[in-house]
């Protein structure tokens, strides 16, 4: 018998959590996309007005809070992909291959320039 990957297990746990609360009726793609944005902005608040060094120096309770915000974004993202029938792992692989073509190492290494400015 094949074993579940960790992503499949997480997807299953998200479905169980949602379905036990009868929330599927609210979890349409538009609402999930909105929720991703809202949660991403809650994450962003933790770094607002911080220097790059300060943003790397999070510890303790602050780090745990940030981890929860990251998890909120991830949960909604995984559920959105699931609802739309998108294989998230394959989509990430495809996007990385696409970006590798747009940003070849010999032109983009050490540069923050956009692909059309390389």
Model region roles, listed by residue range:
Residues 1-70, 74-118:
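Flexible "arm" and connector segments at domain edges
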